[in-house]
């Protein structure tokens, strides 16, 4: 009874082990994906949420500023503006998310972003004190707004500009053009004008600068609201609202979309582009799939910035909704981001007009587009969507147009390069170790699953058969032993009776017994 019970128990355990192991081997990728999804969903107090709020990876930011070397000849329309590139000015960005609020009702989380930029003189070719000549960004932006004003208000403003804003070019140290910013008479004048009289004159900051006031500010990047992935995992890290709106500031008909930068819809699909929502551009920017490569022994999907990503709405309908109403449509290669610069005619492009219409590079001198230095490249691990390396390069350009009664009235329509940034991010060695460990764990899991199937099959079939065979063998041995004993027993009895020695011993024993009895 005990043997049969043991056989049944062994068979059941073996069947369960084989079934579970076979299921694990066949659905290993699905199981791994479910576990990964559970781990990556943003929840309060988890390790992934802590890394998300305070990323372990520092961002190296190289800034390059364009110095206008022949500004004194700008009034001559036959002379092209000439620029020299100064830099890099290396900064280390340490980003943190603050004022984090969780919204379980719609599976989103809100936060503000605060970044600290620390200058690194050892890795910089330029000095903060380098003198930089650039067009008068503030005046150009104000002129752009004045076109929509009434004639009387415009005349009054032109009178004020003759006093406060005659400079067509400004010279400032590089640090002022970057994060420090600087004051101007125009900003002081704008503070004296009642906002109710001329709302367009309201300037949000006390200073002006290409990157001012990004250093340490948590207001400049705006209020973010992203999906946690709890209800729908593919939405993890995707932008839901920015500055409390779900549409862009450039056009209310254009919905916000794209990753906030940390997460991507996984698993990544070959041939499908990825998109980011960039607060510096106030819009989405797509990056096209380029192929695969090996990064530190890991397979990586490569995405590159293409001409299509920077095309206008005519060449790329995906970009059409970002330029509507009063937005200026330009040739492909530049994106209108005026709404992000408080109405100033600022456009984004790849550095040195890389992959842009040749028209832009022919307007100015000093542009040297280079694939290795100016291409945007992103490498991601396909199963987790984890960032392995980013080289994000973007340039800001100012459109200067001839206007009647203005200091630029003799100028030809030109896009002035102002500054470009090279954002470099690389995965840390610790995180890279975890990523490398994943395929090893997957391989070990499959091996263990196969061994589990083999062991389970042995427990179901081989072990019971072996037990039955051994029991049958023992039974045969017992029967054979009994038969052997029976065949040997008569032979032994006959030998004893015929033995003379044994007969003599019996006789002596019987005689002694009679003597003792007397």
Residue positions per predicted region:
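A positional/structural detector of protein chain ends, strongest at the extreme C-terminus
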Residues: 514-518
């Amino acid at each position: 009874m005990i043997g049969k019970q043991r056989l049944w128990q062994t068979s059941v355990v073996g069947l369960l082990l084989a079934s579970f192991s076979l299921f694990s081997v066949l659905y290993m990728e699905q199981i791994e994906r479910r576990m990964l999804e559970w781990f990556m969903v943003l929840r309060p107090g988890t390790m992934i949420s802590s890394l998300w709020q305070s990323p372990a990876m520092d961002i190296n930011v190289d800034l390059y500023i364009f110095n206008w070397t022949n500004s004194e000849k700008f009034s001559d329309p036959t002379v092209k503006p000439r620029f020299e590139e100064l830099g890099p000015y290396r900064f280390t960005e340490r980003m943190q998310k603050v004022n984090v609020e969780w919204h379980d009702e719609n599976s989103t989380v809100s936060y503000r972003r605060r970044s600290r930029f620390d200058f690194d003189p050892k890795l910089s070719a330029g000095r903060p004190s380098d003198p930089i000549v650039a067009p008068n960004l503030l005046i150009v932006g104000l002129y752009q707004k004045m076109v929509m004003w009434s004639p009387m208000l415009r005349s009054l403003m032109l009178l004020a500009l003759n006093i406060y804003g005659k400079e067509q070019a400004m010279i400032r140290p590089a640090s002022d053009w970057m994060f420090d910013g600087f004051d101007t008479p125009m900003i002081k004048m704008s503070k004296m004008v009642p906002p109710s009289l001329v709302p367009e004159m309201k300037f949000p900051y006390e200073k002006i600068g290409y990157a001012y006031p990004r250093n340490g500010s948590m207001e400049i990047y705006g209020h973010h609201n992203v999906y946690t992935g709890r209800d729908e995992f593919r939405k993890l890290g995707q932008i839901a609202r920015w500055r409390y709106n779900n549409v862009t500031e450039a056009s209310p008909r254009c919905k916000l979309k794209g990753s906030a930068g940390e997460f991507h819809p996984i698993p990544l699909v070959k041939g499908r582009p990825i998109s980011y929502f960039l607060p510096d551009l106030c819009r989405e920017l797509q990056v096209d799939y380029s192929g695969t490569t090996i990064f530190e022994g890991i397979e990586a999907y490569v995405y590159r910035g293409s001409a299509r990503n920077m095309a206008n709405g005519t060449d790329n309908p995906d970009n059409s909704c970002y330029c509507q109403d009063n937005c200026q449509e330009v040739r492909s290669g530049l994106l209108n981001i005026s709404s992000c610069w408080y109405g100033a005619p600022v456009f984004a492009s790849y550095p040195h007009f890389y992959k842009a219409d040749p028209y832009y590079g022919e307007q100015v001198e000093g542009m040297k587009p280079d694939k290795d230095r100016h291409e945007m490249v992103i490498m991601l691990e396909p199963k987790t969507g984890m960032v392995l390396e980013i080289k994000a390069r973007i340039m800001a350009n100012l459109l200067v147009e001839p206007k009647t009664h203005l200091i630029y009235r003799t100028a030809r329509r030109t896009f002035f390069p102002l500054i470009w940034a090279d954002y470099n991010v690389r995965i840390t060695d610790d995180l890279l170790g975890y990523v490398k460990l994943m395929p090893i764990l997957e391989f070990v899991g499959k091996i263990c699953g196969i061994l589990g199937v083999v062991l389970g099959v042995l427990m179901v079939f081989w072990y019971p058969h072996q037990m039955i065979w051994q029991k049958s063998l023992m039974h045969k041995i017992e029967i054979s032993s009994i038969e052997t004993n029976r065949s040997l027993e008569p032979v032994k009895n006959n030998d004893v009776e015929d033995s003379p020695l044994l007969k003599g011993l019996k006789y002596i024993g019987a005689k002694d017994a009679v003597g003792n009895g007397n």
